[in-house]
Amino acid sequence: QIVSDFRISIGIGILKNMFHITAVDLYGNTLYTNTIPFPYSNTPDYYKQVTDKIKEFIATNQYDEEKILGVSIATQGITSPDHSTVLYGNIMNNTGMILEDFSRYLPYPCYLEHDSKSAAFLELWKHPELDSAVVFLLNRNLGGAIITNHQIHQGSSMHSGTIEHICINPDGPLCY
């Protein structure tokens, strides 16, 4: 049997006015979570403060550095195929956010992903029998991801599943 907390992963969910930090074990169980009110700002000071809070979270929960597998950062925005940059992020005004803004301050491997696709990864992890699904992420802004053949469908330009931009009423208000 695997010792569930022999290694842990840290998940960061960045929203417009706050961010969440979560520690999960090798089975995907949540160990600790914290929500920090902190408005997003594309500034070096923002990234430094967020990464300082991540390090503080790890220290407060008494995790040795060698236990940390990595840090996954989920945000509202379409990421590049190599997961290094937010290519389109009008909800939070985070177009151009780069993974290196976080990783330069953290001694762990880091990964950047669209928040809806991160939710779909969790569904696949928790439900290995899941073959095809549409995942809806319901928060202030609707999001979605498509799972086919046990894979998250990316689409030709990483836009697959971004149902938040489906036009329901052409005469209605604009998204942003």
Located regions from the model:
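Active-site/binding-pocket entry motifs
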Residues: 20, 77-79, 172
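Glycine-rich phosphate-binding loop and adjoining helix at the ATP-binding site
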Residues: 34-132
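Glycine/GP-enriched mid-protein hinge/lid loop-to-helix segment characteristic of carbohydrate kinases
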Residues: 33, 108-176
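Hydrophobic "anchor" residues
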Residues: 30, 85-86, 152-153
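Hydrophobic residues in beta-strands and at strand termini
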Residues: 2-4, 38, 75, 138, ...
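Acidic surface patches and DE-rich sequence motifs
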Residues: 25, 80, 169
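Gly/Thr-rich phosphate-binding beta-strand-loop-beta motif of the actin/hexokinase/Hsp70
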Residues: 2-33, 134-148
